[in-house]
Amino acid sequence: MLKLIEDAIERTSAAPQASAPEVRTQSDIDEELKKLLEQIQAKIYVVGVGGAGCNTINRMMQVGIQGAKIIAMNTDAQDLLKVRAHKKILLGKELTRGLGAGNNPKIGEEAAKESEREIREALEGADMVFITCGLGGGTGTGAAPVVAEIAKKMGALTVAVVTLPFTVEGIRRIKNAEYGLERLKKNTDTVIVIPNDKLMEVAPNLPIHMAFKVADEILVQAVKGITELITKPGLVNLDFNDVRAVMKDGGVAMIGIGESDSEKRALEAAQQALNSPLLDVDISGAKGALISISGSDVKLEEAQQIIELVTSKLDPEAQVIWGIQLDEELGKMIRILLVVTGVSSPYSVAEEEEESYFGEEERRPIKLDLDEL
């Protein structure tokens, strides 16, 4: 066995021999296989809704996400113009005239309903739809649940990845966020919740504008980590059905992120992910978990240590899936993204309270005639 391992390492390291026969890489069968793979590859769409969602989309386009179509949706024409995406949709052209939703989720909701046909066309053929937004404002809070409802009715596995506002942003945004979260829970398979306040525990001295950037980065890593386990060749890949099994009807999900480059990097990274302030819930009753392991030289033994540690914290009946992605930029570091689904969530509000969230400040959707201004 040792010799077999040594031979495998030697073949990997050795330079190709000049006398080796040339291999045809563009044969007819290769082309047929490529076409077949294109047909059976899961179609994954990532939709950023509202200002925060579109900021996340910009970051995704910057870092790159393999095998996903990126769509930006907003009621603010000026903000939408600045976004890089494969497709853009200005929501509620007649209702808002591109001026935004004014922090009113009701306007965001009506704007998305006005643009339902465009949304349906943009999501046509999707197997999985990620919806990213920051809850608390008008467009993301109001429109994201409408987009989610459309995607789910079209048969796509629908996963929202959302941030909750910092406490310092005020009670109105917090109440708006609670309203939006309840509606998303009804219209998605899984909602991954990232409470911004928890970032203060990770980096308490972070300036507020940088804290928002960190929140964007966590959203990006969550979506990218899950997507590329399906779409990007790696040491251990998942297929779409694996992910569907864990995320379908997954309810509220939380994430933990850990990384380490020490001698015991695998265990330390796993422990960090499990103890992450972002994962500040009891996971013992969770329905499932997805573990994404990244590194330039992850060993099989290290992967085993990570899986065993995580599964030891979960219900024995929980469904756990995992994959390994090669990332040369991490050097000697191992990074773990842990997504735990079906957790008991503190982010629930009574259904009968929903209509009172906007109070006296609520504004009804209006049409603006700019020619009269």
Curated annotation (Swiss-Prot):
An example of a Gene Ontology cellular component annotation for this protein is: cell division site
Chain spans, region Disordered: 354-373
* Keywords tagged on the record: Cell cycle, Cell division, Cytoplasm, GTP-binding, Nucleotide-binding, Septation
Q: Mind telling me which InterPro entries this protein's record contains?
A: Cell_div_FtsZ (IPR000158), Cell_div_FtsZ_CS (IPR020805), FtsZ/CetZ (IPR045061), FtsZ_C (IPR024757), Tub_FtsZ_C (IPR008280), Tubulin/FtsZ-like_C (IPR037103), Tubulin/FtsZ_2-layer-sand-dom (IPR018316), Tubulin/FtsZ_GTPase_sf (IPR036525)
Instruction: Supply one GO BP term.
Output: FtsZ-dependent cytokinesis
Chief subcellular location: cytoplasm
List the Gene Ontology MF annotations in alphabetical order: GTP binding; GTPase activity
Source domain of life is: Archaea
First and last residue of the signal peptide: none
SS bond list: none
Positions binding GTP in this chain are G51, A52, G53, C54, N55, G138, T139, G140, E169, R173, D216
Q: Please give the CDD domains that the UniProt record associates with this protein.
A: FtsZ_type1
Cellular location of this protein?
Cytoplasm
Q: Where is the composition biased (Basic and acidic residues)?
A: 360-373
Per the entry, what this protein does is: Essential cell division protein that forms a contractile ring structure (Z ring) at the future cell division site. The regulation of the ring assembly controls the timing and the location of cell division. One of the functions of the FtsZ ring is to recruit other cell division proteins to the septum to produce a new cell wall between the dividing cells. Binds GTP and shows GTPase activity.
Which protein family is it in?
A: Belongs to the FtsZ family.
Q: Subunit details for this protein?
A: Homodimer. Polymerizes to form a dynamic ring structure in a strictly GTP-dependent manner. Interacts directly with several other division proteins.
- Quote the PANTHER family the UniProt record gives: CELL DIVISION PROTEIN FTSZ-RELATED, MITOCHONDRIAL DIVISION PROTEIN FSZA
For this protein, the record's NCBIfam families field holds: ftsZ
What is the protein name given in its UniProt record? Answer: Cell division protein FtsZ 1
